[in-house]
């Protein structure tokens, strides 16, 4: 789980009709958040060169009530972090260090651990297929739940250990369709793409992201991390996770499946 301070809810400028000094309607935003039961959000509107609008709404904690702080609140990015994987891959493509349609095994340099679909060994797993979620990788939800543990014990395996454990021809975690013919959302496929970045760049994936994406954007890398330990001095700024549910059993089910999210039932208005 990757965390990033300050932002993080980006609205596309053209999509909400902001031109010149116009700003989004505050009441509309507040009503929209309330409608889908979001306790709080930090919103920023940007174009290619400027920040046009930024504002915090609601709370990062309901009990006790603690408002979202545009400069301090720390959000878990979850799957939004996949955009960083794609950006990193495309940087290496632009540098001609990798090719989107080359078999990823060429970059992994693991002669004794090749990754391929067991039923379609001649169909290469490529970065294009990984980034488009069309590599036919289908690790079960039940297995994915085992990744999540309370606190900093989540994801103790390295990228390589995780990839070669679950994405290999000796497992059953594959769709019965050849790679490239079907789209199926895959966390493990994205992780494999991140491993390629790590191997080609010859540095830890997180270090690559900080040095080649975040620092050039002017992001304070001291406020970015993948573990709670990266934020020992400001853990109070974590935005709490809430589940909207009509009964506590729903929340209990989520907490059993993904305890690291520490979900809390949101009060339901009468």
How would you describe each model-predicted region?
Residues 52, 64, 84, 90-110, ...:
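Short, well-structured active-site flanking segments
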Residues 74, 103, 124-128:
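Alpha-helical scaffolds flanking conserved acidic
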Residues 10-22:
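N-terminal signal peptide
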Residues 29, 43, 49, 76-104, ...:
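Active-site SXXK
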Residues 116-270:
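Short, surface-exposed loop or secondary-structure junction motifs
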Residues 59-62, 71, 103-113, 144-150, ...:
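Short linear capping/connector segments at secondary-structure termini
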Residues 22-75, 97-99, 112-114, 167-176:
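Short, conserved catalytic-motif segment at the N-terminal edge
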Residues 1-8:
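Classical eukaryotic N-terminal signal peptides for Sec-dependent ER targeting/secretion
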